[in-house]
């Protein structure tokens, strides 16, 4: 038995209207969104969401940022919203970075009238390359001996004090500056982004770098170890004029995009503001031995999360031999020297900066290196110095003379031979001694002759040179400087007026 529910007329009208509304609401399912559809960015831009976002606690809301660093070159227009800015640089070109004092009145009063130290670094942006940074930089050093990754253009810079560049850290420079005075530093980046790509077949994209600045104030001991502020920005480095072409290409591509597509990208700014980041962790594999004219004091900082801050974990350092204990010092490196003895020899001869590179090298391994090998490994300056040290080469003296002491017996033999034959004889046997002069002065010659005679220099009254017709010419600095190299002289001694002194005659 079938039941049928009879609705009143008014209810039928209501039901019909609800069905039509429901059908209309389902009619859009499966169709593509039109231009007038809502986008998520529009939804998030509604006041209710903005108010909710502003109510969230900000980590840096009450944080004092004492400084601001501005790279005076335009950012790329091809960077999407909510992404970090990207700036293109030309290889070897000088770019200005302005160091601005961002403190409010009364903030950090301990900096008033004081200098601060800033350390500039060019580091990798990609996490993968950060883990192998040391190997990457050593490979670059091998291919570009004598070159640096980062330099300061000192003549163009303003307000920087005591700029320094450690020869073992090619990507780092540092200087002191006064926040109360105008300070602008011009930097040059000499490596290009494509030098660190995995495959180099042409047309590949270069890896991005970061320019990071860490600033420190002076502690109670006068060392700049107390961290104040760190900031960085993302860059790509091209061959000369390549950055200008890339900027122009990005700008032309953006001009061809529709207004809706352009809204997804941030505009190109005239300058690049470095954003706050965590301090760069100390690189532990760098030798603690200071280079000439470079203060190698090291700081250790915790690694934290920050905007654009690389979470860099340096590889553990290789053990360095303590040269002060356990081994008898060796003067010359021998083929039989062990790797430990080779490390000791490197430290004693001021090659500690390269000790890690030669950790497993024995004496034979080092001595087999050619001149080109050590120059490629250590650069031209240190490479030539290491090669000369390995080969035991001494510095050639400025002047070498040979002298022989004329004895009474030889003088009598010569006189007798002359009397018998009527001429000077050459049968006498003379033994000469070499005298090496560096300063080429009369005082230096006096000291060297005194050593030869095993007497005090004060016992030599005057030194003469026998001239034409047997005259005695007083030796002076100018005369010694005009001696021919490897000249030969016979030394004759004459008793001076005083009992304990002598006159020396060079014949």
From Swiss-Prot:
DNA-binding as annotated region, ranges: 133-395
Subcellular locations according to the entry: Nucleus
Role summary: May function as a transcription factor.
SUPFAM superfamilies: SAM/Pointed domain
Protein name: Transcription factor CP2
Subunit details: Component of the SSP (stage selector protein) complex, which appears to be a heteromer of TFCP2 and 2 copies of NFE4.
Taxonomic superkingdom: Eukaryota
Species name: Xenopus tropicalis (Western clawed frog)
Biased composition (Basic and acidic residues): 241-265
Gene: tfcp2
């Amino acid at each position: 038995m079938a039941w049928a529910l009879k609705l009143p007329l008014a209810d039928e009208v209501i039901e019909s209207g609800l069905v039509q509304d429901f059908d209309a609401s389902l009619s859009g399912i499966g169709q593509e969104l039109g231009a007038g559809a809502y986008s998520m960015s529009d939804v998030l831009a509604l006041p209710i969401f903005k108010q909710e976002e502003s109510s969230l606690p900000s980590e840096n809301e009450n944080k004092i940022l004492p400084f601001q660093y501005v790279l005076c070159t335009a950012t790329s227009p091809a960077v999407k919203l909510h992404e970090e800015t990207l700036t293109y640089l030309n290889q070897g070109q000088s770019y200005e970075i302005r160091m601005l004092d961002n403190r409010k009145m009364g903030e950090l009063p301990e900096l008033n009238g004081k200098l601060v130290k800033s350390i500039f670094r060019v580091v990798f942006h990609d996490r993968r390359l950060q883990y192998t940074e040391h190997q990457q930089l050593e490979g670059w050093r091998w291919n570009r001996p004598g070159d640096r990754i980062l330099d300061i253009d000192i003549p163009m810079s303003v307000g920087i004090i005591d700029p320094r560049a450690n020869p073992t850290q090619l990507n780092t420079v540092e200087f002191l500056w006064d926040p109360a005075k105008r300070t602008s530093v011009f930097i040059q980046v000499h490596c290009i982004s494509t030098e660190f790509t995995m495959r180099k077949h042409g047309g590949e994209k270069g890896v991005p770098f970061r320019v990071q600045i860490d600033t420190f104030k002076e502690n109670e001991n006068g060392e700049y170890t107390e961290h104040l502020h760190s900031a960085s920005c993302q860059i790509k480095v091209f061959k000369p004029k390549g950055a200008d072409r890339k900027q122009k290409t990005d700008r032309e591509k953006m001009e061809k995009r529709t207004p809706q597509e352009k809204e997804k990208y941030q505009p190109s700014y005239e300058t690049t503001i470095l954003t706050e980041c965590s301090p760069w962790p100390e690189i532990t594999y760098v030798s603690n031995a200071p280079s000439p004219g470079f203060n190698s004091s090291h700081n250790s900082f915790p690694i934290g999360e920050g905007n654009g801050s690389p979470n860099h974990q340096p590889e553990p350092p290789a053990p360095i031999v303590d040269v002060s204990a356990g081994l008898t010092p060796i003067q010359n490196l021998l083929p039989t020297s062990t790797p430990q003895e080779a490390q000791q020899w490197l430290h004693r001869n001021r090659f500690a900066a390269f000790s890690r590179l030669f950790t497993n090298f024995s004496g034979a391994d080092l001595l087999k290196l050619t001149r080109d090998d050590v120059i490629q490994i250590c650069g031209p300056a240190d490479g030539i110095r290491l090669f000369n040290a390995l080969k035991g080469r001494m510095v050639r003296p400025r002047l070498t003379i040979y002298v022989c002491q004329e004895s009474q017996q030889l003088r009598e033999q010569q006189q007798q031979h002359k009397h018998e034959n009527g001429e000077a004889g050459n049968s006498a046997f003379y033994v000469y001694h070499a005298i090496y002069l560096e300063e080429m002065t009369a005082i230096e010659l006096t000291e060297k002759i005194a050593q030869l005679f095993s007497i005090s220099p004060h016992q030599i009254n005057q030194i003469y040179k026998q001239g034409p017709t047997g005259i005695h010419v007083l030796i002076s600095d100018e005369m010694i400087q005009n001696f021919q190299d490897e000249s030969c002289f016979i030394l004759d001694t004459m008793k001076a007026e005083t009992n304990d002194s002598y006159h020396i005659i060079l014949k």
